[in-house]
Amino acid sequence: MTEFVVAIPARYAASRLPGKPLRLLGGEPLVLHVARRALQAGAGEVWVATDDQRIADALSGLAEVKVAMTAASHASGTDRLAECARIAGWADDTVVVNLQGDEPFAPAAGIRAVAEALVGGNAPMSTLATTVEDAHTLFDPNVVKLVRNVRNEAMYFSRAPIAWHRDGFARSRDTLPAGHNWLRHIGIYGYRAGFLQQFAAMPPGQLEQVESLEQLRVLEAGFPISVAISPEPFPPGIDTPEDLERAEVLLQAMAAR
C-alpha cells in the first residue's frame, strides 16, 4: 500500500457555517469524525492544521492525531497546509493527502485512491472524481465538473457543464444524453510535499479567479493533475446548517446498519 500522510485544514471562521469544525455531529465535533476517517484509511501520520485553540482542544482525546497551529491570515486551505508541512518537517517526496475538514463520511478507499494516483505517474498532484448521475447536478454551478485525457489527467475543471453535448442539450437539458459519462469533482487532493510548497507560492491564475477554483492555478501553470475515480460513494461535505442536518440523518442510518 502507498505510504502517505493526511493533513486536514480546519479553519474556525467558515463563512457559511461559523465554527464548522466544532459543530456537533452525533454528539461529537465534526473535525473529530474527519480525523478518524483519515486514521481508518491507514495514513502514516494525521495532522490537523488550524488557527484556533478550541479546535486543537477538541482533538486532545485522539492521541494519534497531531495539531499544527497555523496563521489565521492564510487565504486558502492550501496555504495552511503548506505551513503545516513545514511544521511537520515532511520530506519533499512525501505523499500528502489534503482531506477537507468538512468531510465526515470520506471513505477510506477514496482517501487511499488519491494517494495511489500520485505513485508511478508524472503528476505532482492528484484528486478524485465520480460520475454525474443527473442533469440537475450537471447544470448546478455549485457542483464542479471536470474532463480527463487518456492519461487520466485533468484537462479542465469548471462550474459549467463540461463537456457540452451539442445535439443532446439542444433537444433537452432535463436529462443526460446517452453515450457520455460526465464527471463530478470531489474536493480531496494529493500532492508531493515539495510541490505543495510550490503550489502555495504560485500567484493566482486568471482562470482560477474567473471560476473561483484554486486547482485551476496548477493547470494554468502547466502542471498535470492525476484524476482517479472514487472506488466508493463519496457523500457530500458539510457547508450549511441544512447539510449538517442531512449528515445527522445519514450518520444515524449508518449506525443502524
Swiss-Prot record:
Q: In which pathway does it act?
A: Nucleotide-sugar biosynthesis; CMP-3-deoxy-D-manno-octulosonate biosynthesis; CMP-3-deoxy-D-manno-octulosonate from 3-deoxy-D-manno-octulosonate and CTP: step 1/1; Bacterial outer membrane biogenesis; lipopolysaccharide biosynthesis
Q: Which Pfam families match?
A: CTP_transf_3
**Which Enzyme Commission number(s) are listed?**
2.7.7.38
Q: Which Gene3D superfamilies does the record match to this protein?
A: Spore Coat Polysaccharide Biosynthesis Protein SpsA, Chain A
Reactions it catalyzes = 3-deoxy-alpha-D-manno-oct-2-ulosonate + CTP = CMP-3-deoxy-beta-D-manno-octulosonate + diphosphate
Q: What does the protein in this record do?
A: Activates KDO (a required 8-carbon sugar) for incorporation into bacterial lipopolysaccharide in Gram-negative bacteria.
Its recorded name reads 3-deoxy-manno-octulosonate cytidylyltransferase
Lineage, uppermost ranks: Bacteria, Pseudomonadati, Pseudomonadota, Gammaproteobacteria, Lysobacterales
